[in-house]
From Swiss-Prot:
The keyword Transferase does not apply. It comes from Pongo abelii (Sumatran orangutan). InterPro entries: ARM-like, ARM-type_fold, ELMO_ARM, ELMO_dom, ELMO_domain-containing, PH-like_dom_sf, PH_domain. A motif (SH3-binding) lies at residues 700-707. Pfam families: ELMO_ARM (PF11841), ELMO_CED12 (PF04727), PH_12 (PF16457). One of its GO terms (biological process) is apoptotic process. This is Engulfment and cell motility protein 2.
Amino acid sequence: MPPPSDIVKVAIEWPGANAQLLEIDQKRPLASIIKEVCDGWSLPNPEYYTLRYADGPQLYITEQTRSDIKNGTILQLAISPSRAARQLMERTQSSNMETRLDAMKELAKLSADVTFATEFINMDGIIVLTRLVESGTKLLSHYSEMLAFTLTAFLELMDHGIVSWDMVSITFIKQIAGYVSQPMVDVSILQRSLAILESMVLNSQSLYQKIAEEITVGQLISHLQVSNQEIQTYAIALINALFLKAPEDKRQDMANAFAQKHLRSIILNHVIRGNRPIKTEMAHQLYVLQVLTFNLLEERMMTKMDPNDQAQRDIIFELRRIAFDAESDPSNAPGSGTEKRKAMYTKDYKMLGFTNHINPAMDFTQTPPGMLALDNMLYLAKVHQDTYIRIVLENSSREDKHECPFGRSAIELTKMLCEILQVGELPNEGRNDYHPMFFTHDRAFEELFGICIQLLNKTWKEMRATAEDFNKVMQVVREQITRALPSKPNSLDQFKSKLRSLSYSEILRLRQSERMSQDDFQSPPIVELREKIQPEILELIKQQRLNRLCEGSSFRKIGNRRRQERFWYCRLALNHKVLHYGDLDDNPQGEVTFESLQEKTPVADIKAIVTGKDCPHMKEKSALKQNKEVLELAFSILYDPDETLNFIAPNKYEYCIWIDGLSALLGKDMSSELTKSDLDTLLSMEMKLRLLDLENIQIPEAPPPIPKEPSSYDFVYHYG
């Protein structure tokens, strides 16, 4: 007979003694269990002790976390967190450097435990650590190693969010900033210093001001030219944090400073085009920098043109002058009157494609795109003058009904690009889709506009469009751009080539192909056949998911970015009635046997499956402090009485497999993206196989009519 669910069998170790094999009743108070363990070894004062895990990060066990103890777990009897904190507090201030170094090593390890961290912080432990850093006594032996452990402990303690970052002194900030600015500083010290500064900036506006005064752009950029991608990532993360928290009136100054120090080209050459693959966290930081850079355009995008502002009107005059040359300026003509000049201006503004021919300034009063559209037009006219003049003159010489209005097109195109690139929106925590081509030019948005306005003009000609077709052309251009961007061209020239291949005829072909594929499967007979086949396909997918669960998968345990990963394995019994699981020393290369998995949970006890932020192990820390992909890969099984089994899938595929399989076990619909994809693929294949004999045969919308009954049934023969 299996033991009750409240009883867990564990081994408890104590240095110099034989391990105790104990059955722990989870309903008993933890203090009572600790007393029983101490009595087994004749240890006095059981209140001085506690239990913690023997493996991994060796976390302390509390009344709140004791439910995580599983059968077969090896525990240690250890001194209580309060005593450990007190002893480490004394040892970290010892005059013996070896003692102090050992204490710092242990402190850096224990600080990841929130139970210990709370005790240590309550003893003003953070103040002690900051003073040790502030003293900066470099003459001490093991200085670099000791400092690295001190900064690690400080960062771990602050990560728990128990105390505010505002308690940090200006002296401490100067000291940490000094490690970032010093040449040839130890890599581990530099990494932790960058991480501490980033956390300070993100968590405190007042600290942002102080750090911005201490750290220069040049100091951070120098760390991007190293070969260590982790240091590069932390440096860009700090740059992004400073950029994000800077007041709006300071952001443009920061961008100018970055441009002067060639930040973009350094990132391009040393990070994007480096010899190492871009890791997920680096890709996210590059995406954030890309978004923050484009967000500098928001002010101009939301600024309306003032029709009475002469400086702004002069820009429109400049556009006209460049397009039609100063020689044609009516003000230069002898005896030119005001009315004649106005008529000439109106004619020119019409040829420039403005909607309001008399006062084109009114075209820029809509936001978005506001003044940003005028900025783009002026950039094109001055930097790519030949292209600008060609587009304007080419359209002004066409028949009226086929001319592409440059002014209106430029305004709508600018608005479209702002929508596609989401100018003005904050970075998304879960995204990492940066575009390398935007790091190849200091004026990437303006260059992108220049490429796309030529695309628009080309597409207009290919469509033989008229003014009535303007919106249709813009829809095609949007489709061309959005189809080209996912290929992530490495340069603007590659992007231009990709757009060239997506001509109007190619877009029509793609649309037709997609529409035909869709239409083929929308006729009533096909829909009826599809509905008949779908349950069979879903059952096939369900069996595949359950078979994968029976094979099992390895999962990593939740951990801090500075801790070594630990793994556990879970697989479904062949009769689909029990989940077997257990801890592993390493990530397994093959299948793990049922016999080696000590724990099990009956499927009948499962109450629900939760995902993402609803998971208990995701609520311990905020999403900002988690790895960017963890939330999307997390799920938990809630089972009787009030237990949880927490998972972090190794990838999105395994996540979908397990969510589908567990849903199928509970009799629920499989709703993952993978199921939808598999269903579409398998249904499409099955439908095509069944319809092979009907190739080139028109399938009628309705079944053929039933013929009338014959006048007699004399043709019927009855077999005797």
